[in-house]
C-alpha cells in the first residue's frame, strides 16, 4: 500500500511581505501544496492522510475564513482525484476552527473517497483500519480538572488520550493493517527552540504497522 502523509498546511495570510496585495508567505504555502498535488498525481497513492492544522488561524473574519476553506477544498479535491481515499483530520482548535471544518465537510458530502474527521473514530478501508485522533481543546480539559499544575495537567491529559486510543484500538479489525492518525507532540521531543528531537522509549498501546502524526 502506498500512503501519502501530510499535515500542518497552515493555509492563510501570515506576517511577512506582500506584493500587489498578495501575502507572499501565504502564496508560498499554496505553491508548496500545489507541488504536493503534483507529486500525488505522479505517485497515485492508495491513501492520503492529512493530520490536521489545515488552517493557520481559527479566529478570523468570516470572509477570509471562507476564502481559506475554498483554497483547502481545491487542494483536497485534487488529491481525491489522484488517490484512492483521502482522510482529513481537524488539528488544534487555535488553527482549525469548528466552523471552517463544518464548511469543509459540506463541500465533500457527495465525494465518496474523502472523509473530513472532527471527532475520534475508526475508518475502515479494504483491510485497513485508520484510528483517527484529532486535536483537542485544552480549555475543555482544564474546565474538567481545574487547578492542576503543569505536570499534573500533562499527566491527566496523557491518561485521557491514552484511554481514547485504547477505545479506538478495540474498534480496529483484528486482521487489519492499523494506522494511528493523530495531532500530538511525541513525548521526549522539544522543538520549541530548535529542530533537534530527542526520542525516548515510551509506553503506548500497540497498533500494528504505522503511525502518522503532526504538531
Residue ranges and their predicted role:
Residues 7-9, 53-54, 92-94, 135-136, ...:
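Active-site metal-binding loops of divalent metal-dependent hydrolases
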Amino acid at each position: 500500500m502506498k500512503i501519502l502523509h501530510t499535515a500542518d498546511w497552515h493555509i492563510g495570510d501570515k506576517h511577512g511581505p506582500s506584493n500587489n496585495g498578495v501575502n507572499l508567505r501565504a502564496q508560498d504555502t499554496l505553491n508548496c501544496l500545489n507541488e504536493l498535488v503534483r507529486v500525488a498525481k505522479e505517485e497515485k497513492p492508495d491513501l492520503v492522510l492529512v493530520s490536521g492544522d489545515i488552517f493557520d488561524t481559527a479566529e478570523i473574519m468570516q470572509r477570509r475564513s471562507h476564502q481559506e476553506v475554498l483554497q483547502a477544498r481545491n487542494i483536497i479535491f485534487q488529491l481525491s482525484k489522484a488517490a484512492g481515499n483521502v482522510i482529513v483530520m481537524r488539528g488544534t482548535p487555535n488553527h482549525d476552527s469548528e466552523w471552517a471544518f463544518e464548511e469543509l465537510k459540506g463541500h465533500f458530502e457527495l465525494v465518496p473517497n474523502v472523509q473530513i474527521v472532527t471527532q475520534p473514530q475508526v475508518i475502515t478501508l479494504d483491510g485497513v483500519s485508520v484510528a483517527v485522533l484529532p486535536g483537542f481543546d485544552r480549555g475543555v480539559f482544564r474546565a474538567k480538572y481545574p487547578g492542576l499544575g503543569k505536570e499534573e495537567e500533562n499527566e491527566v491529559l496523557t491518561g485521557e488520550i491514552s484511554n481514547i486510543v485504547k477505545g479506538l484500538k478495540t474498534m480496529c479489525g483484528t486482521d487489519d493493517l492499523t494506522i494511528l492518525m493523530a495531532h500530538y507532540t511525541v513525548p521526549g521531543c522539544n522543538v520549541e527552540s530548535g529542530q533537534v528531537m530527542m526520542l525516548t522509549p515510551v509506553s503506548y498501546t500497540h497498533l500494528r504497522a504505522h503511525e502518522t502524526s503532526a504538531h
